[in-house]
Structures are given as structure tokens and as C-alpha cells.
Amino acid sequence: MTEIDPNINEQEMAEVINSDKDIDSDSNTVGLTLFAQLQNQLRLQQEELLQQQRELLSQESHLQLLQSSHSSISNTWNFTQGLVVGQLSVIFLIIIFVKFFVFADSSSSIPSKFVARDGAGVIVRRDNKSTTSRDRHNGIGGKDSNLEPSTDDERLQNNRAKVSSILEKTYYDVNNHASESLDWFNVLIAQTISHLRTEALLSDNIYHSLSNFLDNSELPDFLDKINLTEIDVGDDFPIFSNCRIKHSKEDTGRLEAKIDVDLSDTLTLGMETKLLLNYPRPLTAILPVAMTVSIVRFSGCLTVSLVNTNDQEFQADQVARPSNGHTSTDNGNDENGKGSSSEDKKGGTALMFSFAPDYRLEFVVKSLIGSRAKLQDVPKISSLIENRLRTWFIERCVEPRFQVVKLPSLWPRTKNTREPAKPKDSDDTL
């Protein structure tokens, strides 16, 4: 803008102002035209860029289509190739299996001597490992250590080694361990005896079984039929206490449990019969006899141990048993012995028990003899019956004799599986 001279008049000042306005308007029009030209150039450049982008996108899409077509062709070929190879491999394996396993020649199979050792190769025998290490320490070859012991000394050493291993792994000191009370065992035995009493008294089972036994027994000619008059199975239970584990006195390498047993109860069996006098002629005289025998007290030391029925000492005892002079007292169990002989040959685990000679057994014998003039509680008869019962007990259960009861198999089986009965729904009861 031009500087205004203060000496100029108003008309000149107006002209100057108008000239300035014209100059400003001209400059504005020039700026607008320039701005419009720039906008047109920008639009043209943007359109060119968009066209180039479209061309690039079209080229990329075309390339992707080409690549996808090539990959699909290769994938289909790989899938077909894998399918064919898999089918061929399966057919090849089936042919090999049928040829070498289904139609294999029996002569080319494994010999029997190697087949018998398959189980030994599968089952881990820790005893063999311990004996092998022990034999190597003693200078014995490894091949001979796997053989079964052929002498009693070797078997005794093996039993001692097993017993020492058991005591070591269970942390039980035979010499210093305190005796146990066996309270839990008393509860289990009491429950078992209670169930047995219930079954015995149910429908008079014990009466019928004893009556059948007496009827089938062979009686002497001077005895008439025996009738049962009283049966009392008691209501108390034995108490086991003071249990301690000891080594066997016979030096057999076994462990045995010594348990004190005490029973204070009344177990009664009453019967009546007739004595027949058959001289000089049959049934010359008849003498009625009524008798009641009760066991009121028993206490003693029970020795229990687990044994193997295949041991030589038990096999020798079974062979020598028929030559024993007391076999006549077991006439009622001959059939059971014959039936169990086949089971004894198979062997297995058995429970061996016996009582110490210092046992205590008290009887109460009541007798009544005669028809009109009766003799009551004859001491001679009481002592005779008591001695006979003691002899019967000593010959079977008092040391050095013992009883061997074969234990059933504890292996779980389907036929032994049970489950609790489900209670009926309330809708069914209604």
C-alpha cells in the first residue's frame, strides 16, 4: 500500500483508496485462479494413482489365482499319492501277517523248552536277583543259582532269607517287639461266631446235622439209637490276646504267631440212649442212659503259622498218616479225606495251628442211669468221658501234633463278586 501524504486533500485520498481496492481484488482473482489450477492438478494425480492401484490389485489377484490353481493341483496329487502308498503298505502288512502268523508251520515254531521259560522272562523274580547276588558273593556261578534247591539245607537257607527279608521290610523285631492285644481281631471273630450261631440255630440246622451224623454212624451192638436232648451253643466269645511273632522251634525257617486264648462259656450237648445186654440172648436187659456234657472253660496258647502244603514234611506226614493207630477215630471223615486228597496234590497255602501242652480244659458231665432206680452223676462215668474227650483233643490239636487247613484262593474272581442290594423305590412299595 502507498503511504498517504497528510497534505493531500480528501479527493485524492479517495482515489488512492479506490486504487488500493482494485489492486486487492486483482490479487484475489489471481489467487483463486491459481488455487483452482492446483486443485485440478491434484485431482488428475489422484485419478492416476487410483488407476495404478487398480492395475496392481488386478495383477496381484491374477497371480494369486494362478498360485492357488497350482497348489490345488499339487495337493490333489499329494493326497492321491499318499492314499495309494497307504493302501499298498496295508496290503503288504496283511500279506506278511497271513503268511507268517496264520499259515505258519508248526515245525518252525519255538521249541517247548524255550516256551516253558517265557513266563520266567516276563515275571520279575526278585528272589532270584537276591540269590544271584548272594551266590556271586559266595563264588557260585550265575547259571546254577537259578536252579531249584535240591537239599533240605538249601531250602532252609532260602526260607531263612525270605523271613529275614520280611522282618526287615516290615520293621518288626522278633526279639524286642511288644506283644499285641488283638482287640480288632476279637471283634471280627465275635462277628463270625455270631453269624455261625445264627445259621446253626436257624430252622434247627445244627440239630438235624448232628442227628443225621449220629444216625449214619456205626454204633456197637450194645448201644441203641442215640437221641439228642439238649444243644447249647453258648452266648460268649473267645478272647485272643498277647500275640507275639516268633521263629519256629523246629528250625524250619518259618515265622509263627503265639496267641493266648481264653473262653469262659457253656457249650452243652445232651443225649440219651440205651445200653443193650445181649447175653445170654439178644436184648436180655435194657439200661436207659441220659448224659449231658458241657465245656465251661478253655484257655491255652495257640500257635498259628502259614505253610506251603508242597513242603516235604507235610507230604511225608500225609504218607505216614494211614499207618497211624488212631485212624479209627476218624471214620466219620474218611469220605471228606478222599475227596480232598486230589486238592492236596495241587498244593497251596495252608493254615497250621496247634495248642501248647499246658492248656486248660474244664468239663461238666452229668449222667443219669437207670429206669426205676436211677444213678445220678456217677464219678467213674464222668472221668471216663472226660478222659476220652481230652484224648481226642490231644491226638489232633496239641503239640507236637497240629492241624493243617488249606486256605481258599484269594484271587479276585467274577463268581465271587457281589454288590449291595439296592433299596426299592417308594413308588414300587406303594
Curated annotation (Swiss-Prot):
Residues 178-408 form the SMP-LTD domain. Residues 126-138, 335-346 have a biased composition (Basic and acidic residues). Residues 104-430 are cytoplasmic. It is found in: Endoplasmic reticulum membrane. Residues 1-82 are lumenal. The keyword Transmembrane applies. GO terms for biological process: mitochondrial genome maintenance; mitochondrion-endoplasmic reticulum membrane tethering; phospholipid transport; protein insertion into mitochondrial outer membrane. One of its GO terms (cellular component) is endoplasmic reticulum membrane. It is a single-pass type I membrane protein. It comes from the Eukaryota. The chain crosses the membrane at residues 83-103. Residues 126-154, 315-346 are annotated as: Disordered. Its main location: endoplasmic reticulum. Component of the ERMES/MDM complex, which serves as a molecular tether to connect the endoplasmic reticulum (ER) and mitochondria. Components of this complex are involved in the control of mitochondrial shape and protein biogenesis, and function in nonvesicular lipid trafficking between the ER and mitochondria. The MDM12-MMM1 subcomplex functions in the major beta-barrel assembly pathway that is responsible for biogenesis of all outer membrane beta-barrel proteins, and acts in a late step after the SAM complex. HAMAP family: Mmm1. Belongs to the MMM1 family. This is Maintenance of mitochondrial morphology protein 1.
